[in-house]
Amino acid sequence: MQCNINDIIKILPHSYPFLLVDRVIECDPGMSIKAIKNVTFNEQFFIGHFPGHPIMPGVLIIESLAQASAICVLGKKTVENKVVYFMSIENAKFRKPVTPGDTLILQSNFEGLRLGVYKFKCVASVGKEEVAGATILAKLQDK
């Protein structure tokens, strides 16, 4: 499954300026996803993070990964009228700054479901270089 921005807007409840996934390159719904966030200088967070040395906040990289994971879950045909709520992160690591002009590659792999909580192993990369990673826990809820 691939998605453009128009498809993503229909899947996720987020909107500008907090929609942080631009395109889905590939997705095996419920199992794995590879998506893109194009990081541009026009992002509002660059106004104050940091003037003269813009860096994408790590928490927003994690949020991008959480949104990609939500698309992975919500892409299943058996899931309708639901929303995915981010519950927690484990083992978050930030390895390299993400700056304007970077294409952030978001990869998320389903690792399990326990008591209604989805577990995803996530990695964000620029090119072939890993810039961040975390384990994300999320829960599916009615809209």
UniProtKB/Swiss-Prot annotation:
SUPFAM superfamilies assigned to the protein according to its UniProt record, in alphabetical order: Thioesterase/thiol ester dehydrase-isomerase
S-S pairs: none
Keyword Repeat among record annotations: no
Alphabetical UniProt keywords: Cytoplasm, Lipid A biosynthesis, Lipid biosynthesis, Lipid metabolism, Lyase
GO molecular function: (3R)-hydroxyacyl-[acyl-carrier-protein] dehydratase activity
Subcellular location field: Cytoplasm
Active-site positions on this chain: 49
Entry annotated with the keyword Transferase: no
GO-annotated cellular components: cytoplasm; membrane
EC annotation from Swiss-Prot or TrEMBL: 4.2.1.59
Biological function: Involved in unsaturated fatty acids biosynthesis. Catalyzes the dehydration of short chain beta-hydroxyacyl-ACPs and long chain saturated and unsaturated beta-hydroxyacyl-ACPs.
Family of this protein: Belongs to the thioester dehydratase family. FabZ subfamily.
Descriptive protein name: 3-hydroxyacyl-[acyl-carrier-protein] dehydratase FabZ
Organism (species): Wolbachia pipientis subsp. Culex pipiens (strain wPip)
Higher taxonomy: Bacteria, Pseudomonadati, Pseudomonadota, Alphaproteobacteria, Rickettsiales
